[in-house]
């Protein structure tokens, strides 16, 4: 059976190993998603992370995380990632005629994090253009936007006022390394 890694997961599911910064009964590996040194190169067929990347700083940590995730993916492996879509959240936040101040406050929390524990702070806002650039720099190809991943009951499927607020993407580690001339 091919190994699959769920980074930041909170729901146990057969066939998936969960890595999280905080221990719990569902967690297989406690650790930081920036350092997957416990795993060999190319050992996972899939890596899934929902609402994780926005917790890293955009200058150093986000590129390092994607490089690590790329490293542990097998050639031809898929990264399934979900982030709060800054474009959608910003648009909704500006709809003063639709949302009252309390509803807009909840939208603001989706942008900056809920601040419910030490890891619940968002350090970067992401949209499809930003994600495409980060994923390309990390060596991923074949970027696809998907409506939903339908793997876990998680924040990737959050809907506000009938609008999905997550940017759900699939990207692939090339099956063969590019030949440089």
Describe each region flagged by the PLM:
Residues 31-48:
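A short acidic, Gly/Pro-enriched loop at the edge of an enzyme's catalytic core
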Residues 59-68, 74, 78-179:
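S-adenosyl-L-methionine-dependent methyltransferase catalytic module, highlighting the catalytic core
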Residues 15-35:
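Active-site regions of enzymes building and remodeling cell-envelope glycoconjugates
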Residues 2-13:
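Conserved class I S-adenosyl-L-methionine
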Residues 45-60:
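A short SAM/SAH-binding and catalytic strip from SAM-dependent methyltransferases
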Residues 7, 19, 146:
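The conserved SAM/SAH-binding core of class I Rossmann-like methyltransferase domains
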Residues 17, 29, 48, 79-82:
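Conserved Rossmann-like nucleotide-binding pocket used by diverse enzymes
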């Amino acid at each position: 059976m091919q190994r699959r890694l769920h980074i930041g997961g909170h729901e146990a599911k057969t066939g998936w190993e969960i890595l999280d910064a905080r221990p719990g009964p569902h967690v297989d590996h406690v650790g930081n998603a920036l350092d997957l040194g416990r795993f060999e190169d190319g050992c996972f067929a899939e890596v899934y992370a929902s609402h994780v990347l926005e917790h890293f700083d955009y200058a150093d940590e986000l590129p390092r995380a994607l490089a690590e995730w790329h490293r542990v993916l097998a050639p031809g492996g898929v990264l399934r990632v979900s982030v709060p879509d800054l474009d959608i959240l910003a648009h909704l936040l500006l709809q003063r005629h639709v949302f009252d101040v309390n509803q807009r406050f909840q939208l603001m929390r989706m942008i900056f994090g809920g601040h419910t524990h030490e890891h619940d702070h968002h350090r970067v806002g992401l949209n499809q253009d930003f994600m495409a650039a980060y994923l390309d720099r990390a060596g991923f190809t074949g970027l696809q936007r998907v409506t939903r991943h339908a793997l876990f009951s998680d924040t990737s499927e959050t809907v506000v006022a009938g609008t999905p607020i997550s940017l759900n993407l699939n990207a692939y580690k090339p099956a063969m390394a590019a030949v440089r001339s």
